[in-house]
Amino acid sequence: MLQADGRISNLKLAEEVHLSPTAVLDRVKRLHREGYILGYEARLNPGKLGAGLLVFVEILLDRTVHDVMDSFKAAVQVRAEILECHLVAGGFDYLLKVRVADMVAYREFLGTVMWSLPGVRETRTYAVMEEVKNTTALPI
């Protein structure tokens, strides 16, 4: 229930799960303490904020050695446009999830940012035409 509505009141949550408000509060606190709940955040409309284009970018590094990978990971951390970065197994090294205003903005981002990231040898871009499913809820 908290995944679907992180702002649900303790009283409403207690009613939904048929427990006392005190028991629910204790359980939620325990979930925080034990690291099951990492935090709460607002879901924003990217289009309204000038970030309507979602792209996924495959990154192939010139060398997969620790110093190159560490430099790449550090550089990715400071770019707000890069929402996610995953080291993957397969035909490339990293998969990035990037949000920008539009294709013109992405072209600029690709030329000025992506190619200046440490160790980047090759990129492949996949522009999202339609978000069919977008959730952060885990299947529990």
Model-based region annotation:
Residues 1-140:
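A compositional/biophysical signature of low hydrophobicity enriched in polar/charged and small residues
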